Curated annotation (Swiss-Prot):
Residues 1-10, 126-137, 145-156, 538-554, 685-697 have a biased composition (Polar residues). Residues 499-514, 572-616, 656-678, 705-718 have a biased composition (Acidic residues). A motif (DEAH box) lies at residues 958-961. This is Helicase swr1. It catalyses: ATP + H2O = ADP + phosphate + H(+). Belongs to the SNF2/RAD54 helicase family. SWR1 subfamily. Residues 1382-1532 form the Helicase C-terminal domain. It is found in: Nucleus. Residues 334-408 form the HSA domain. One of its GO terms (biological process) is chromatin remodeling. Component of the SWR1 chromatin-remodeling complex. Gene3D superfamilies: P-loop containing nucleotide triphosphate hydrolases (3.40.50.300), SWI2/SNF2 ATPases, N-terminal domain (1.20.120.850), Tandem AAA-ATPase domain (3.40.50.10810). Its main location: nucleus.
Length: 1695
């Protein structure tokens, strides 16, 4: 027994026996459990150590295997060791150092030399011998026994390997799948007991990977444990108990990964904190000097001894052979030198050639191998083709069929995908068509609503109520809201005949009655009116019968009575309603055309859909929420004094509310106002009851006389009264006249022709127009009195003829056609059109409608607004609070206007600093403190939280184009204010596009509570889609090329906007307004401008920027170009010209050498040479001083004080003392005595110099010499000619004229000073300093007199300065810019003609240049820009208007174009053009407004052949859009009474406005000579391409439309698919198709049926298959996803 082993074997034999036992045990395990081999590793087994059985439970894998297992001989219980990797009692150190690194002994093997001597320690050999002893001692392991088992095995670190060790038998090999499954199971062990630990897993694991035998043999010492084998009975018992475990764990268990943060151990003691290093590196320690001994320090004996030893060691090391010797130390080695490059020798050539040859051989070998491989393949293929077996042929056929089947499947899949895409495209096209139809229906409803509102307002202006008319039209459109049965719903559907014809159960008693019988039947109805009769009379006989038209009107009356809860009339079945009954015309070119949008066929095709849609909302332009439509909510302002005036009802229960509006019951039973009445424009003023009673009196003679002759009434019905021309005579239409007179009047219109009769409007329009012509014609003749009216006055503003007439005087009674009197609070006189504007605004307020007052600037929108607020205070007793938001520049202007026109209002101007505004807000909740608050847009944004707390009654926004962008903060903030009514004031409602107009309209019409908003304007997409086509055509091709469809769309837009926009022009309402002339002045670029412009455009960076498409970069480039056009100094400042200054000239480079030479050669010590002058031995050298000066110098001499100091110093000095250095004290005294001697010598020297310097005295002195000197130049005047001078010379010297002609240098320099200043501009290329000093040497300088060295006047100084530095000439400011040159000429002409001008520009720096320009020319001017304070603006405007000496007022177009009255000027000059032409229009209206007495001329400066030409073109396009949409819409009060037959039938006067004329002058007309070539020259290439593409798209669209109306066959196909698909629920099959039926002449042609195409069948099948799938709509690219709240999320990339 050796080393404790059982058999005394060596270590080598022990290892061999251990391997054999291990292999045998593995074979046994493989044989014994082949079906469950994969699960056996998971089965807990028992092991016996020293005869004691223990449970071996697999646990989590350990990091490293222990080298020495625990000693379990003393432990009798199977308790696992703790902690997991080691026992609690650790044998040996817990850590050790290995290779300089600290390692833990828990996971690393402790080296033998570090392990302490102990009885428990076991070496590796002892460990292996212990294992062998246990194995052999138990006697249960037999190599040949198949039942022998080894220890349970697991891979290293708990991972099982892929197989077992084999002994050559095939039965012992574990299948690969089983091993893989064993690996998967081992990673996630199943049910673990709480006692399982990592130590058990490591103790019972062994390697079993056959592929890594070498690695396993190397790790065998650490992998083999001391666990003995298990008994067979106990093993199979355990296996039986866990048999089903492998089945449960057959599938892979997901691996869980839990990430936890590394725990942070807190500091429990101050010593735990590691102190920072004092030095970060050895170099820092060396540099710090710590530990170094200073040179002057005193060392202790011990330190001195240590230092001596170190030095001795260093000396020894420097000896030969030492470490620091030159032979050993590397410091003495010479620096390595770079070796020269070796020459390319023959050997290098040989090697390179050999390598190249090797490369060629390799390529050849590869080529040969590839060729051989291909040849072998070819041979194999040929052999297979020659000798094919039947099974090979069958296999090839099967393979070919399989490939074809796969390809066919792919082709079918691709075909079905294409079919699916085509079906989706067809479905999407159908969806788009349906959406277009829905949009068109919404547009038709909007037009119908606007038409009804317009007609009602028109009737009100003409003196009629119009309530019945509006009720009838409303009933026609949307039916009755209160539908209690299906029959009533069918009755209310006025636009479809399908529902009427399908309802066969109801019997219409009135269907067979004539018009006369119906009148007799319904003659006693209380609400019969003249309007109803006129509508029945004006019915079109070609479309429907007379009885039907009359019954239609009576049905409306019945609906009104039904809605009031009265006894309903007998229900009338209506047949074929004319949708154009209430329209003014069917022509496409009139303003009231095509109100219904489609014809009767379209209305019939819509069916009940239009009825359903008409009940959805109140209409397009209802500018208030649905809350206001409830009757109870309509009176919610009663407490504010805003309750409508009651109207006297006719015969008691007339079914009208207080406002004269009909009441209907909706589906819920609530009473609401009718939709059309809700948005009506009828002004219910104080005289409303009187007017209605008068209208009732007028109606009664006609409606209450059933005894009229039937023939006359039939004649009225049969005669088409709509085309009757206005009567030429002045005979008025009396309300009491019989019906025959009406027929006689209408018969006079038969001369207009049959075409007028066919295209007519209702009779009410003709009668109204006739009354207008009779009452307010050119003669302005008043009509005679009638039964119910007083003698009328001219009620049309067209009667205002003479421009020199005085404006109408205010009166308490309103003018004819006006229901609103001028409030007595208003001071001053309203003009007639302003009174009409007040009436229009009052009508909007009475009907709870918001509007836009868009009068041209200068017509008094401010006065009309003030009059409206005064009207509310007088008539409705509503004093406020009102909010007026204006630009900052006109706050004080509004305050002055309020105090001037309505001093009864209390005004608060809300502006100033934060503290001032806080003071103004104190006590402002009291309504009596102020009535109107005037503030600016900026302050509204700043103090929005405070302003939102108030409930404002009326909110007025001046210059409302500030909220044209609905995305801006201003728009969104003001939209949330709580107001009763809103009014927008703007002179430019349309500036750039229709979206801005939509923003204004939506601001007046906020959306409902559900978020959908009122139909129409609340949907920007629909609004833009409706009117997109005319906008594109106008901007791209001009207004002259609009087609008929575009004109119809524009007319529809006018119809929608007309009730809500009031727009009057100065030329229409102000006849005395002076004319306005616009001029475009083209200015050439100067040479400098052209150089800068072309240079900037030719830059590569500019071209890249313009081609990049970046909006901001392009705008920046355009702004730079505009700066060049305005003035080159804005782009690049003209530099001050200076010469290149050399620091040192060539002559002065040798100054230092010259000084050195002179000093060495000419230097003389002053004491080596006798100076007689210093010794006063040269008496005549002192004659330059006077005797008095010499006496003063002697008197001030310091000889006496110096002598006293010398005596004192002499006494203090010890002249006998010698130097004694024995002691410190004696040394210091000797040094001090030497210093005294030096001071004594210095005093003596000063005393000597003082005596010599002040002892100089002159012999005569300058005073005596000057006294005795006589001036030889001053001779007497009468002196004779000198004998030495000739007579001619003497006479020339005496002549003053000749003396003036011959000037000296100084005089000539002074005379030429102006020329030098103006023309000395060429500076030398370079200048150098020191030339004068080099030219005048010091020796020569001493011979120059003082007078010559310092002359009093230098004649060349000015020329020298001008030629050394040249400032730019002031005149270059003008000559560098072509615009300023043209402006100079224009200002001189204006000043000569007595005109005054306003100059507008966008750039503030340009204002600075204009100031310099005006100062140069001496023009008086004023300036106003954004930095001007609010208080100063009004002062400046008043000063300019009152002082005629001021020629020019220069302003910024952004700040000086808002609300400023500058009528003192009659000329407007736009120095540069604005991107937005509306801004220029506002600027020019600063002087062209009320109060201007002279014609206004407007000049626009445009630099030719530059970007400004394109800006002008774009501005003209925007002006044309404004002209077409706004100006031609005739949104005036005249339009209510100005309609005639010519307007109705579409005869428009083709007149060009000023914008079109300017466009023709600049770009010519498209129809002129040159055509497209002229456009190509004027426009950019991008614009030309865009126009051509748009033209192609239009042509293609026309072709498509034409193709839709014709028969189309798909080329290349046999037939056309069926129009109707298969029935729902049926699978489409192969069907025969015939020629489609076409509406035309039926011809008997025999057509044989032809089979359809397979593609058509596929499309039908796919469409049937996809019928239940939802349609995927394309994403809306215009909508941007909001990132609000998602800023923290990062977008993930798609992989």
């Amino acid at each position: 027994m050796q080393d404790g082993s059982l058999n005394g074997l060596s270590h080598h034999n022990d290892e061999r026996v251990n391997h054999e036992n291990e292999d045998k045990s593995l074979n046994t395990s493989a044989l014994g459990d082949s079906p469950d081999s994969a699960n056996r590793e998971l089965i807990p087994s028992e092991s016996k150590e020293n005869g004691v059985p223990t449970d071996s439970i697999e646990g989590p894998p350990s990091k490293r295997r222990k080298l020495a297992g625990p000693d379990n001989s003393r432990r009798s219980t199977p308790r696992p060791p703790s902690p997991p990797w080691k026992k609690a009692g650790v044998d040996g150190p817990t850590s050790f150092l290995q290779d300089g690194k600290r390692r833990s002994s828990r996971v690393n093997a402790i080296p033998l030399e570090l392990q302490p001597p102990s009885d428990k320690r076991k070496t590796r050999a002892a460990q292996r011998s212990t294992v062998n002893k246990n194995l052999s001692g138990n006697g249960k392991v037999v190599a040949s026994s198949p039942l022998s088992m080894s220890v349970s095995q697991s891979g290293i670190n708990g991972k099982h390997t892929g197989g077992n060790l084999t002994t050559g038998s095939p039965r012992t090999a574990t299948p690969r799948g089983a091993s893989a499954r064993r690996r998967r199971i081992s990673r996630s062990p199943p049910r673990q007991t709480p006692s399982r630990t990592r130590s058990q897993s490591s103790a019972t694991s062994a390697p079993n990977d056959p592929t890594s035998h070498n690695a396993r043999s190397k790790r065998s010492h650490s992998n083999v444990t001391s666990t003995p084998t298990i008994g067979i009975d106990e093993l199979w018992n355990d296996i039986g108990g866990e048999t089903d475990l492998g089945d449960e764990q057959g599938q892979r268990v997901p691996r869980l990964r839990i990430k936890v943060k590394k725990p942070v151990i807190g500091f429990q003691h101050p010593s735990h904190v590691i102190p920072p290093r004092k030095y970060n590196s050895f170099r820092e320690w060396l540099e710090s000097g710590e530990g170094r001994i200073e040179d002057g320090a005193v060392l202790t004996p011990e330190a001195a001894l240590v230092e001596a030893r170190k030095r001795c060691r260093v000396l020894e090391a420097t000896e030969p052979g030492g470490l620091l010797s030159p032979e050993v130390c590397s410091a003495y080695l010479p620096e390595q030198q770079e070796e020269p490059p070796q020459q390319y020798s023959h050997q290098d050539h040989l090697v390179a050639h050999a390598l190249y040859f090797k490369k060629l051989l390799d390529q050849e070998h590869r080529r040969h191998r590839n060729t051989a491989r291909l040849l072998a393949q070819w041979c194999a293929d040929a052999w297979r083709k020659r000798n094919k077996r039947p099974e090979d042929i069958l296999r090839e056929q099967q393979e070919e069929v399989r490939v074809k089947r796969k390809q066919l499947a792919r082709d079918l899949q691709k075909m079905f995908d294409l079919a699916r895409a085509e079906v989706d495209r067809m479905r999407l096209a159908r969806w788009e068509e349906e959406r277009k139809v829905e949009d068109q229906r919404a547009l038709d409803r909007a037009i119908k609503q606007s038409t009804m509102l317009f007609e009602k307002r028109r009737l009100e202006i003409l003196g009629e109520t119009g309530s019945d008319f509006l009720d009838s039209t409303d009933a026609e459109e949307s039916g009755t809201d209160a539908t209690t049965s299906d029959a009533e719903e069918d009755e209310s559907n006025m636009s479809s005949t399908d529902s009427e014809t399908e309802d066969e159960d109801e019997v219409d008693d009135d269907e067979g009655l004539t018009a006369e019988e119906l009148r007799q039947k319904y003659a006693d109805l209380p609400q019969s009116s003249l309007v109803s009769d006129r509508e029945s009379v004006a019915s079109d006989t070609s479309e429907s019968s007379d009885g039907t038209r009359t019954s239609h009107i009576l049905q409306n009356i019945e609906d009104i009575n039904d809605s009031q809860g009265e006894t309903p009339l007998e229900q009338i079945e209506l047949d074929e309603v004319d949708p154009m009954l209430l329209d003014d015309s069917e022509d496409e070119s009139t303003d009231m055309d095509d109100d219904m949008g489609d014809s009767d066929e379209d209305g019939d095709a819509d069916g009940t859909d239009s009825d359903d849609e008409s009940d959805d909302g109140p209409g397009l332009l209802g500018f208030f929420s649905s809350k206001d439509r409830v009757l109870n909510d309509a009176h919610r302002f009663d407490d504010e004094g805003d309750d409508p005036l009651a109207v006297s009802n006719h015969e008691g229960g007339s079914g009208f509310d207080d406002d004269g509006q009909s009441v209907s019951v909706d589906e819920d039973g609530d009473e609401e106002l009718e939709d059309a009445d809700e948005v009506s424009l009828v002004p219910n003023g104080p005289s409303n009851s009187v007017s209605i009673s008068q209208s009732t009196a007028e109606v009664s003679p006609v409606t209450e006389t059933p005894d009229e002759e039937p023939d006359e009434q039939a004649e009225v019905v049969d005669t088409d009264m709509a085309a009757a021309a206005p009567s030429e005579g002045p005979a008025p239409l009396e309300a009491s006249a019989p019906l025959e007179d009406l027929v006689a009047i209408d018969k006079r219109g038969d001369a207009m022709g049959e075409c007028h009769r066919q295209q007519c409007s209702p009779l009410v329009n003709n009668l109204d127009e006739q009354e207008l012509r009779q009452n307010g014609g050119a003669s302005s003749e008043a009509s005679p009195g009638t039964l119910a009216t007083k003698p009328s006055e001219p009620e049309s503003i067209s009667s205002f003829e003479a421009p020199g007439e005085k404006p109408p005087q205010p009166s308490e009674s309103p003018a004819p056609g006006l229901k609103t009197p001028i409030p007595h609070l208003l001071r001053g006189t309203l003009r007639e059109y302003q009174h009409y504007g007040l009436d229009w605004l009052a009508g909007l307020y009475n009907n709870h409608i918001n509007g836009i007052l868009a009068d041209e600037m200068g017509l008094g929108k401010t006065i009309q607004t003030i009059a409206l607020l005064a009207h509310l205070a007088v008539e409705h007793e509503v004093w406020g609070p009102h909010l007026v938001v204006v630009p900052t520049s006109v706050i004080l202007n509004w305050e002055m206007e309020f105090k001037k026109w309505c001093p009864g209002f209390k005004i608060m101007t809300y502006y100033g600093s934060i503290e001032e505004r806080r003071q103004k807000r104190k006590g402002w909740t009291d309504d009596t403190s102020w009535n109107v608050l005037i503030t600016s847009y900026q302050l509204v944004l700043q103090d929005q939280q405070v302003l939102k707390r108030r409930n404002w009654h009326y909110m007025v926004l001046d210059e409302a184009h500030n909220i044209k962008n609905f995305r801006s903060q201003k728009w969104q903030t003001l939209l949330t204010f709580r107001t009763r009514a809103r009014l927008l004031l703007t002179g430019t409602p349309l500036q750039n596009n229709l979206t801005e107009l939509w923003s204004l309209l939506f601001f007046l019409m906020p959306s409902d509570g559900d978020g959908t908003g009122i139909e129409g304007f609340a949907d920007l997409r629909n609004f833009s889609e409706w009117f997109r086509r005319p906008v594109e055509q106008i901007l791209e091709h001009g207004r002259e090329t609009m087609d008929d469809e575009t004109k119809r769309v524009v007319t529809k837009l006018h119809t929608i906007l007309r009730p809500y926009i009031l727009r009057r022009l100065k030329a229409d309402v102000e006849k005395q307004m002076p004319a306005k002339y616009e001029h475009v002045v083209y200015c050439r670029l100067s040479k400098r401008q052209r150089f800068l412009y072309d240079g900037f455009m030719s830059m590569a960076q500019t071209k890249e920027t313009l081609a990049s498409g970046n909006y901001l970069s392009i705008i920046n480039c355009l702004m730079q170009l505009r700066k060049v056009c305005n003035h080159p100094d804005l782009f690049e400042t003209r530099q001050i010209s200076t010469s290149f200054v050399m620091h040192h000239s060539v002559a002065t480079e040798y100054a230092s050498k010259e000084q050195l030479v002179r000093r060495r050669l000419l230097y003389e010590h002053p004491l080596t040479k006798l100076d007689l002058d210093f010794l006063n031995l040269v008496p005549i050298s002192r004659e330059d001083i006077s005797r008095r000066l010499a006496d003063d110098s002697t008197r001030l001499m310091a000889y006496g004080p110096f002598n006293i100091l010398r005596e004192r110093q002499y006494k203090r000095t010890n002249w006998q003392m010698m130097f004694d250095g024995s002691t410190v004290q004696s040394t210091l005294e000797a040094l001090e005595n030497d210093a005294r001697k030096r001071r004594m010598a210095e005093l003596e020297r000063c005393l000597y110099f003082e005596s010599k310097r002040h002892g100089r005295r002159p012999v005569y002195g300058t005073s005596l010499v000057e006294f005795l000197t006589a001036d030889s130049k001053q001779k007497p005047t009468l002196g004779g000619r000198p004998q030495t001078q000739s007579l001619a010379e003497w006479l020339s010297n005496r002549s003053s004229i000749l003396a003036s002609m011959i000037l000296s240098i100084e005089e000539r320099s002074q005379a030429m000073d102006g020329y030098v200043r103006r023309f000395a501009c060429v500076t030398p290329a370079a200048v150098a300093s020191g030339i004068t000093e080099a030219a005048l040497t010091p020796i020569e300088t001493r011979y120059l007199t003082e007078k010559e060295r310092f002359p009093p006047y230098d004649p060349f100084h000015e020329a020298q300065m001008r030629l050394s530095i040249a400032f730019p000439d002031k005149r270059l400011l003008q000559y560098d810019c072509g615009k300023l040159q043209r402006l100079d000429k224009l200002l001189r002409d204006l000043k000569a003609g007595g005109h005054r001008a306003l100059i507008f520009t966008q750039m503030t720096k340009m204002l600075d240049i204009l100031e310099q320009f005006l100062n140069i020319h001496g023009h008086r001017y004023l300036r106003l820009d954004g930095t001007t304070k609010v208080e100063q603006r009004q002062i400046l405007t008043d000063r300019f208007n009152n002082d005629d000496r001021i020629l020019v007022f220069i302003l910024s177009s952004r700040s000086g174009g808002l609300g400023i009255n500058l009528t003192g000027a009659d000329t407007v000059i736009f120095y540069d053009l604005d991107w937005n032409p509306a801004m220029d229009k506002q600027c020019q209206d600063r002087c062209h407004r009320i109060g201007q007495t002279r014609d206004v001329h407007i000049y626009r400066f445009v630099s030719e052949h530059t970007i400004e030409s394109n800006i002008l073109r774009k501005a003209n396009q925007k002006r044309m859009l404004d002209d077409v949409v706004i100006q031609e819409g005739e949104f005036t009060t005249d339009y209510f009474t100005k309609l005639d037959v010519r307007d109705m039938i579409g005869e428009e006067a083709e007149a060009q406005d000023e914008a079109s004329a300017a466009m023709d002058r600049v770009l010519s007309s498209r129809v002129a000579t040159g055509g497209s070539r002229v456009f190509e020259q004027a426009e950019d290439k991008e614009d030309i391409d865009a126009a051509k593409n748009a033209q192609k798209e239009m042509e293609q669209a026309d072709n498509d439309d034409f193709g839709d109306r014709s028969i189309s066959h798909t080329p290349g196909q046999v037939g056309t698919p069926l129009a109707t698909g298969p029935q729902e629920g049926e699978t489409p099959g192969a069907q025969l198709i015939t020629t489609p039926q076409i509406h035309g002449v039926d011809e008997t042609v025999d057509v044989e049926p032809q089979p359809g195409h397979i593609d058509d069948y596929l499309l039908r099948f796919m469409e049937w298959n996809m019928k239940d799938e939802p349609l995927v709509l394309p994403p809306d690219k215009t909508k941007k996803k909001s990132k609000k709240g998602k800023e923290h999320r990062l977008s993930k990339r798609r992989r």
